[in-house]
C-alpha cells in the first residue's frame, strides 16, 4: 500500500469512527495515551484531525506486522500534531502508536520535513 492509499484509508476510517457510537475503529497504544495526556490534548480532537491528515513519512513494512506511517494534521486550535498510525486493513481500523507536537529543532517550519 502506497502513501496515498494509506492517507485515504486513515481519513475514511477516522470519518467513520466519528460517526460510530462506540469509536472502535481507532485504537490507542498505551504509549500514545501517555503522550496524549502529556500534550494535554483530547482524544476526540486528534481523531477528528486524522480526517484531514497528510502522510509525511511512509514506513516500509519490513519488521512490522501492520503497515504504518507518520501523519501530520492540526487540532481545532490550529496546533499541528504528528501521529504514527498503523493500519489494520483486515479489521478496518487504525492503531495510534504515538502522537506528539512536532518540535522546531527536529522539523522544518512546514512540519513535513525533518531537519538534517
Ranges and model annotations:
Residues 1-116:
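Ribonuclease/tRNase effector modules and their secretory precursors
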Amino acid at each position: 500500500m502506497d502513501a496515498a492509499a494509506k492517507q485515504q484509508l486513515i481519513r475514511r476510517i477516522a470519518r467513520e469512527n466519528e460517526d460510530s457510537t462506540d469509536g472502535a475503529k481507532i485504537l490507542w497504544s498505551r504509549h500514545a495515551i501517555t503522550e496524549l495526556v502529556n500534550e494535554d490534548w483530547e482524544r476526540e480532537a486528534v481523531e477528528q484531525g486524522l480526517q484531514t491528515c497528510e502522510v509525511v513519512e511512509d514506513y516500509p513494512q519490513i519488521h512490522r506486522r501492520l503497515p504504518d506511517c507518520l501523519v501530520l494534521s492540526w487540532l481545532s486550535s490550529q496546533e499541528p500534531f504528528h501521529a504514527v498510525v498503523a493500519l489494520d486493513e483486515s479489521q478496518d481500523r487504525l492503531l495510534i502508536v504515538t502522537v506528539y507536537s512536532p518540535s522546531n529543532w527536529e522539523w522544518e517550519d512546514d512540519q513535513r520535513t525533518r531537519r538534517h
